[in-house]
Amino acid sequence: MNYKPKIMDLYILIQLVLISGAATSAMTWFSYFMSKNYRKLYKEPVLLSSVLVQMNIDITNECKNNLGWFLHFVIGFLFVAVYHIIWAEDILAVSPLSALILGVISGIIGIISWVFIFKITHYRPPLGFRDYYIQLFFAHIIFTMVATALYFLTLILLIVTKAYFTI
């Protein structure tokens, strides 16, 4: 049976939300581990919250903290949605090699995004930028490896589910 997923339906949306949540969590755990291990601020949700504080947005610090976490997971979802399109359109196969390629590209995008964010907000967190960007690069590779593995597994489940159940 040759199954090609649609770009988006309810099953795919649920699949992408679950995958992005798990992959973003894996990336975040890696960043928190590196932060603790090297005693540096490598925590993306905390950095996003700090950027929001720097922007003088008129909401409470608790809201800024929650918004930082929310944005982190939304960005993770957007990355996974793009991967899904790449895989669904057969631009790349779902494979360890595509995970590595997408991880490298995502890492570069992540680094460029943080350089841009720090530049436009004039926020200078107390971290070694070179070390942070190296850690961020590898965090994105971990993110993409987890996303690819889960995508493959959930694709199998999706095929079986659609064969036997309808919503």
Enumerate the language-model features and the residues they cover.
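Juxtamembrane/disordered regions of integral membrane proteins
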Residues: N2-I167
